[in-house]
Amino acid sequence: MNIKAIIETAVYVDDLRATETFYRTFLGLPVIGKEPGRHVFFQVGEASVLLAFLAEATLKGDLLPPHGASGPGHFALGIEAEALDGWRKLLQGHGVTVEKEVEWPRGGKSLYFRDPTGNSVELVTPGVWGLPSGW
């Protein structure tokens, strides 16, 4: 009996429209679910979902238990190594500041930037953590 994967990751945002524009239009993630005033969900790869919730909308329980966070969160999206330069140029071309670029001791590289709410988004190439990429 083993856990196989992380299926979904939640981030908490303050503007769903700006969040949808950023992730759908800019990063190219397809929208797979949306409830105005509550959330927008994006497909990431073949088997993962990024859940973007309005923070205050998740504090009251309904179908799901209450959840949420305050302050910026962090998550990483996997990219191919040869796409790193293209992503850097795309980010900079859209006025998105690359906060940090890291070459990891075990292998792989990361670019860090912020979404419209201030969440830390990382684009990471295979080799980080010494694990196979899986993408």
Residue ranges of predicted features:
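Short glycine/proline- and charge-enriched loop/turn segments
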Residues: 67-70
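N-terminal beta-strand motif that seeds the catalytic metal site of vicinal oxygen chelate
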Residues: 1-17, 72-77, 127-135
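Short, conserved charged micro-motifs
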Residues: 18, 82-87
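Core segments of cupin and vicinal oxygen chelate
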Residues: 12-57
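Vicinal oxygen chelate
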Residues: 2, 88-135
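Exposed loop/turn and edge beta-strand positions of beta-sandwich/beta-sheet ligand-binding modules
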Residues: 36, 73, 107
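A short, sequence-level motif marking secondary-structure junctions
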Residues: 54-59, 127-129
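Short beta-strand/turn micro-motifs at beta-sheet edges
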Residues: 61-65
